[in-house]
Amino acid sequence: MRSGQSSRTEPASLPWHPSGLVAGVDEAGRGPLAGPVMAAAVMLDERQPIMGLADSKKLTPARRASLFDEIRAKALCYSIAQASVQEIDALNILQATLLAMRRAVQGLRLRPALVLVDGNRLPRLDIPAQAIVKGDALQPAISAASILAKVQRDHWCVQVHAEFPQYGFAGHKGYGTAMHLAALRAHGACIHHRRSFAPVARSLPGACR
């Protein structure tokens, strides 16, 4: 696999690759104590521009939700994939994230000529790829991918909250807030918690606290 890394890329410099289409890839959910890590791959259509694309973390939930629908309606194609809690615990969070990214690219209906990935690590692909630090703020396709991954994971948290309301997943989205840590101490871990993460491991039966 040919690959490269860049810490700076002009936002409009790579909408199309000379030999074909470009896909942007990003993830959501590396830091939380529970749930899968999500990844999305997006190939934008320059004939249908989407205004306001940005790093998903800098957008309000309402704006993310609006863009989530617009991206899915206007993109040439997109794919959302995940790596499970079991895979995170077996592989570690970095390798599970790269696995989810690879699955997202493999799920695209069209084959890109170049894959732009947010961050400084690349998943194993059979397509030329470039890692771009802060790519979610620099490349519209990566911004779109970050929004799809974030909103999809937030949806998962809301659904799981109905099953396990005592943990408050709908509010903290799985992150290690004071409320979440208190719930872990009170109730122990549920099936969706990442047992390889230290705060969860400390809540398991027999763990030293």
Curated annotation (Swiss-Prot):
Pfam families associated with the record: RNase_HII
Binding, a divalent metal cation: D26, E27, D118
UniProt-listed Enzyme Commission number(s): 3.1.26.4
Domain spans labelled RNase H type-2: 20-209
UniProt-listed GO biological process terms: DNA replication, removal of RNA primer; mismatch repair
Main location: cytoplasm
Cofactor, free-text remark: Manganese or magnesium. Binds 1 divalent metal ion per monomer in the absence of substrate. May bind a second metal ion after substrate binding.
Catalytic reactions on record: Endonucleolytic cleavage to 5'-phosphomonoester
Statement: the UniProt record of this protein carries the keyword Aminoacyl-tRNA synthetase: no
The protein's required cofactors: Mn(2+); Mg(2+)
One Gene Ontology molecular-function label: RNA-DNA hybrid ribonuclease activity
Places the protein is found: Cytoplasm
Alphabetical keyword list: Cytoplasm, Endonuclease, Hydrolase, Manganese, Metal-binding, Nuclease
NCBIfam families with a match to the protein in the record: PRK00015.1-3, PRK00015.1-4
Family in the record: Belongs to the RNase HII family.
Job description of the protein: Endonuclease that specifically degrades the RNA of RNA-DNA hybrids.
Protein name, UniProt field: Ribonuclease HII
Lineage: Bacteria, Pseudomonadati, Pseudomonadota, Betaproteobacteria, Burkholderiales
